[in-house]
């Protein structure tokens, strides 16, 4: 194996994501003609502390959401720095882009520019070596297939309905393999669709493939999922658990949590009690962004009350950022981090966040964004780092299913060495 393979070309273009918004795609060409390609996702409910997604703001084109500035930054500035570099120097490649940007949040080049390049380089390197991406990133010990955290009922910013909490998910922890987990989840999804139809509910889907029915309360969404799990022939709390993503920053106004569908305005303490009631009543194993991103006091109360029995995931709270994560670890809030590549903007920084979380005994959940493409990098990443959990939407819409299908291929490729840890994934809760 040659240990120095030159990058000879870096090219970006504007493509469309799953919401008909422009996004960045990058191709990296190596000296022997090997090509790596990556496309960048985009979020709807974004944390205030995320790296900057550069948009053109030209209202005459794509409602101002064009990404030609980011494309230009790749083609005119990043390419010039990276051409001639060794594709295997991933850390140096990412460091070079950080230095070229020079801001704390990638506000100059755009995280959508740097991430596209970072991932395309990794893909090109893996392809040159004849390795799958998960093998290249993770090495010989990459073997754990993730428990899917499947969003099957949408509310909040992901749907036009009267449900406040953003995502209601299922986690098939009782499955013996990823393949079986996917089958179980798919069966529950179909059963839920039939159930909603029988109740006269709309079965149109939201951004992430989940259904978006108009329900009387957030709790009703949980109830109908439990009913679907049972009707599909599974046992809630044994075969399949429930996970929530309230996206609480979106409902946090003037220091209070506004549950409009239920006519409730709650303090931090009351919001925690609201979750405690739900956890005591239903088989809920994980809650993401239960409190707002700057409600550190609320997070402390929540972690004290539920931190030993429920996975408490920080998304907007941590934004895949080691500085934010370190603050959370020091304050002893949450016990898990959501990993979104585009929140931070390079592969190296993403891996650093996962490593810091694991050292502190926090679990990591690798995640998509609501605006996705056919790019399957996160499927390889979750296996590469043995994270054990992936959040990539319902088993519907091809930009979501692409990730699940890639995981099926990886499980097949790993054969007998593949592990699906199920309930053991949640090693830091009882």
From Swiss-Prot:
Keywords: Cytoplasm, Glycolysis, Lyase, Magnesium, Metal-binding, Secreted. The active site is at residues 208, 340. Its cofactor is Mg(2+). Binds a second Mg(2+) ion via substrate during catalysis. One of its GO terms (molecular function) is phosphopyruvate hydratase activity. The keyword Metal-binding applies. One of its GO terms (biological process) is glycolytic process. CDD domains: enolase (cd03313). (2R)-2-phosphoglycerate binds at residues 166, 340, 369-370, 391. It catalyses: (2R)-2-phosphoglycerate = phosphoenolpyruvate + H2O. It holds the Pfam family Enolase_C. Its EC number is 4.2.1.11. Pathway: Carbohydrate degradation; glycolysis; pyruvate from D-glyceraldehyde 3-phosphate: step 4/5. GO terms for cellular component: cell surface; extracellular region; phosphopyruvate hydratase complex. Mg(2+) binds at residues 245, 288, 315. PROSITE patterns: ENOLASE. HAMAP family: Enolase. Catalyzes the reversible conversion of 2-phosphoglycerate (2-PG) into phosphoenolpyruvate (PEP). It is essential for the degradation of carbohydrates via glycolysis. This is Enolase. It comes from Clostridium kluyveri (strain ATCC 8527 / DSM 555 / NBRC 12016 / NCIMB 10680 / K1). The lineage of its organism: Bacteria, Bacillati, Bacillota, Clostridia, Eubacteriales. The gene is eno.
């Amino acid at each position: 194996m040659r240990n120095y393979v030159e990058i000879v070309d870096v090219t970006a273009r504007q493509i469309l994501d799953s919401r008909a918004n422009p996004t960045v795609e990058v191709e990296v060409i190596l000296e022997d003609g090997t090509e790596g390609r990556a496309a960048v996702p985009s979020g709807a409910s974004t944390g205030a502390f995320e790296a900057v997604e550069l948009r053109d703001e030209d209202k005459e084109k794509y409602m101002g959401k064009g990404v030609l500035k980011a494309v230009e930054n790749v083609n005119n500035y990043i390419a010039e720095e990276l051409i001639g570099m060794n594709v295997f120097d991933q850390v140096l490649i990412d460091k070079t882009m950080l230095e070229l940007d020079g801001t704390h949040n990638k506000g100059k080049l755009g995280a959508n520019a740097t991430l596209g390049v970072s991932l395309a380089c990794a893909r090109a390197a893996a392809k040159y070596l004849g390795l799958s991406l998960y093998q290249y990133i993770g090495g010989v010990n990459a073997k754990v297939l993730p428990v899917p955290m499947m969003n099957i009922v949408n509310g909040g910013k992901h749907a036009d309905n009267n449900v406040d909490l953003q995502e209601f998910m299922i986690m098939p922890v009782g499955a013996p393999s990823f393949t079986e987990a996917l089958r179980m989840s798919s069966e529950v999804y179909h059963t839920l669709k039939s159930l909603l139809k029988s109740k006269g509910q709309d079965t149109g889907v939201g951004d992430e493939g989940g259904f978006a029915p108009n329900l009387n309360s957030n709790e009703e969404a949980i109830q109908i999922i439990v009913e679907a799990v049972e009707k599909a022939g599974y046992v809630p709390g044994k075969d399949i658990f429930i996970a929530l993503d309230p996206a609480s920053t979106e409902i946090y106004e003037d220091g209070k949590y506004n549950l409009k569908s239920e006519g409730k305005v709650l303090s931090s303490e009351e919001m925690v009690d609201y979750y405690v009631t739900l956890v005591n009543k239903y088989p809920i194993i994980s809650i993401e962004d239960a409190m707002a991103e700057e409600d550190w006091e609320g997070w402390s109360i929540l972690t004290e009350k539920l931190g030993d029995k429920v996975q408490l995931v920080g998304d907007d709270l941590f934004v895949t950022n080691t500085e934010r994560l370190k603050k959370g670890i020091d304050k002893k809030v949450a016990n898990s981090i959501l990993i979104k590549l585009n929140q931070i903007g390079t592969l190296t920084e993403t891996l650093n966040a996962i490593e810091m979380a694991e050292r502190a005994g926090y679990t990591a959940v690798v995640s998509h964004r609501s605006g996705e493409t056919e790019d399957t990098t996160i499927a390889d990443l979750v296996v590469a780092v043995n994270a054990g959990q992936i959040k990539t939407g319902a088993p519907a819409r091809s930009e979501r299913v692409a990730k699940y299908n890639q995981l099926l291929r990886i499980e097949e490729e790993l054969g007998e060495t593949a592990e699906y840890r199920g309930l053991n994934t949640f090693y830091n809760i009882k």
